[in-house]
Design a protein with these regions (language model features):
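Cap/insert and terminal regions of metallo-dependent hydrolase folds
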Residues: 150, 157, 239-243, 251-357
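Zn-dependent metallo-beta-lactamase
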Residues: 2-114, 205-222
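Conserved beta-strand hairpin/beta-sheet module of binuclear metal-dependent hydrolase folds
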Residues: 82-85, 89-141, 226, 230-245
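Fold-independent oxyanion-binding glycine-rich loops
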Residues: 92-95, 122-123, 155, 188-192, ...
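Structural motif
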Residues: 87-90, 117-118, 184-185, 211-213, ...
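Short glycine-/acidic-enriched loop or helix-start segments at secondary-structure transitions
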Residues: 130, 162-164, 170, 197-198, ...
C-alpha cells in the first residue's frame, strides 16, 4: 500500500518530535535486532507514528485538492456591491477586553453598517453556559438580539459557532440553549442549520446586502481536522475603501487579499480579525488536544512538526503592508502577543487593538 512507502516512513522518522526515539523507531522499521526494552518502546511508539503517517497522507491529498480548486475557481467582479457610509465593529467576544467584560479564545463581533446590524460569529462558550459569555457581554454593552439583521459564520469551528457540540450538529448557537432568531438570516460557509433563523450556504462570492459581500467559502486543509471552509466579508465604505473582516484566517492572507482584489477595483482600506499567528509562542493557557497546543500545532495548515515561524508572520505583514492599509486590527484569540506587537510596530498609528467592548469606528 502506498502509505507504507519506506522512504516516506524514514522522512517522517527524521521529523519525529521525540528525537531520542528516532534510532529505536528506525531500527524497528528496518528489522534490526532490538533489546526487549527497545522493542517495548518501539511498539508503544509505532501506533502514533503510523497514525501520523496516515494523517499526513490525508493532509497532502487534501492540500493538493484545495490548491487545484483554488487554481481552477473563476470568480467575477462584484461591480454592483454599493457602499455604506458608516461602519462600526464592536467586539463582543475575543481574548482581550476592556474592563471586566468576559473573554474567550473565540470570536464574535457586532458590525453596525449604517442602519443594519450583523453578528459575525458566535464565540466559544466552552462550558456551554446559559446565558453564555456572549449574551452576558451583549447585555453589559446594551446590545440586543433585535439589533441583528444578519448573522455571518466564518467557519465551522467551535470557537466561532458557540462550542464544539454545535460543530457536530452543523449548527451555530449564541448560548448553551438556543435563542429565538426567527427575524435573522444567517450566511454560512458550509451547509448549517438553526432552529429558528433562516440559513443560506454561501459557496462563491456574493453580495449579502448593499455595501457588504462574502468573498466566498475558501477550502483549506488542516492536518488533524481534515478540511475547513472559511469565508471572510468585505465591506465597501464610502470614500475610504474595502474593509475585510476575518474569523481565523485559515485561508491564508494571500488568498484572502488576492480574492478581494479580484472581486473589487476599490483599494483595501483595512483588515480586522484573526489571522492565526501563534508565533513564536502562544499564551500558556492555549487549550490542548492530545497534549499539543491547539492554536500552534493543531488547527494549522501544516503538519505538527512544521510549526509556524517568524518568517511566516513576516510574510503576512509584508503582504498586508504592500496594500498600504489605513487600519489593521489583529484578533488576540489565535495570535500571540509577539505577533500583535509586530503588527503594532509595522503599522504604527494604523494599528488598533481588538478588545471586547472597544468599538472600532471606520
Amino acid at each position: 500500500m502506498s502509505f507504507l512507502n519506506l522512504n516516506e516512513i524514514k522522512k517522517l522518522i527524521r521529523e519525529y518530535p521525540l528525537r531520542k526515539d528516532r534510532e529505536i523507531i528506525t531500527k524497528f522499521i528496518e528489522g534490526e535486532k532490538l533489546t526487549e526494552r527497545e522493542l517495548t518502546r518501539a511498539l508503544h511508539m509505532s501506533l502514533p507514528l503510523f497514525t501520523l503517517l496516515l494523517l499526513n497522507k490525508r493532509f497532502e491529498r487534501n492540500k493538493q485538492l484545495s490548491e487545484e480548486e483554488w487554481a481552477t475557481t473563476k470568480v467575477k467582479k462584484l461591480d454592483n456591491i454599493g457602499t455604506v457610509r458608516n461602519l462600526e465593529i464592536l467586539p463582543l467576544i475575543d481574548f482581550h477586553s476592556e474592563g471586566d467584560l468576559l473573554t474567550e479564545k473565540g470570536v464574535s463581533y457586532f458590525i453596525k453598517a449604517d442602519d443594519l446590524g450583523i453578528l459575525f460569529d458566535t464565540g466559544l462558550n466552552d462550558k456551554q453556559k446559559h446565558p453564555s459569555p456572549l449574551l452576558n457581554n451583549m447585555k453589559a454593552l446594551g446590545v440586543t438580539l433585535e439589533d441583528f439583521n444578519y448573522i455571518i459564520i466564518s467557519h465551522l469551528h467551535g470557537d466561532h459557532v458557540g462550542g464544539d457540540q454545535w460543530v457536530q450538529k452543523k449548527m451555530f448557537s449564541l448560548s448553551g440553549t438556543q435563542v429565538n432568531l426567527k427575524h435573522v438570516k444567517a450566511f454560512t460557509p458550509v451547509p448549517m442549520s438553526h432552529p429558528t433563523a433562516t440559513t443560506k450556504h454561501v459557496k462563491g462570492p456574493e453580495i449579502i446586502v448593499n455595501g457588504i459581500a462574502s468573498i466566498g467559502s475558501i477550502r483549506n486543509p488542516l492536518f488533524f481536522f481534515g478540511e475547513v471552509y472559511e469565508q471572510a466579508i468585505a465591506i465597501n465604505v464610502e470614500r475610504k475603501g474595502i474593509v475585510i473582516i476575518v474569523g481565523c484566517g485559515h485561508q491564508g492572507i494571500q488568498k484572502i487579499i488576492d480574492r478581494v482584489e479580484v472581486l473589487f477595483d476599490t483599494p483595501i482600506y483595512g483588515i480586522i480579525g484573526g489571522l492565526h499567528l501563534p508565533i513564536p509562542n502562544f499564551p500558556g493557557d492555549d487549550p490542548t488536544w492530545s497534549g499539543l497546543p491547539v492554536f500552534k500545532f493543531i488547527v494549522t495548515r501544516r503538519p505538527p512538526w512544521e510549526p509556524w515561524h517568524t518568517d511566516d508572520r513576516d510574510y503576512t505583514l509584508d503582504y498586508i503592508k504592500a496594500r498600504n492599509p489605513k487600519l489593521v486590527a489583529l484578533s488576540p484569540h489565535d495570535s500571540s502577543m509577539e505577533s500583535i506587537n509586530a503588527f503594532k510596530d509595522t503599522f504604527k498609528e494604523a494599528y488598533i487593538d481588538i478588545k471586547v467592548g472597544k468599538t472600532i469606528k471606520i
